């Protein structure tokens, strides 16, 4: 099973873009060359600000969604310190118990 990664890219105007991939360097190069997400095209110089392995695709999608819900301040803490990332992953891996 190929591991999936969550990554954040910083644009020239200091915005953070969140994505997932199985190959961070390849995906970053795609964004740099303008062949990645439309949201990053024409945004100037891009910098890979954060990346971390998250497990399988399902978990990566859930982690991406959760990170996209964070405030800019929380994302900056994640980039600077990895603050809360382990807890975020742990909360996504906790099995949900269905009640009848």
Curated annotation (Swiss-Prot):
InterPro entries xref list: GIY-YIG_endonuc, GIY-YIG_endonuc_sf, UPF0213_domain, UPF0213_GIY-YIG_endonuc
Pfam families: GIY-YIG
Residue ranges constituting the GIY-YIG domain according to the UniProt record: 2-77
Annotated family: Belongs to the UPF0213 family.
Alphabetized HAMAP family for the sequence: UPF0213
Protein name: UPF0213 protein YhbQ
Annotated source species: Escherichia coli (strain SMS-3-5 / SECEC)
Classification of source organism: Bacteria, Pseudomonadati, Pseudomonadota, Gammaproteobacteria, Enterobacterales
């Amino acid at each position: 099973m190929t591991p999936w990664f969550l990554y954040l890219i910083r644009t020239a105007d200091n915005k953070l873009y969140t994505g997932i991939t199985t190959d961070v360097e390849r995906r970053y190069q795609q964004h740099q060359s303008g062949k990645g997400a439309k949201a990053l095209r024409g945004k100037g110089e891009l910098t890979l600000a954060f990346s971390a392995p998250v497990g399988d695709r399902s978990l990566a999608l859930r982690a991406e969604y959760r990170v996209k819900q964070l405030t800019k301040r929380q994302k900056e803490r994640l980039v600077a310190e990895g603050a809360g990332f382990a807890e975020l992953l742990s909360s996504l891996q906790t099995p949900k118990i269905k009640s009848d």
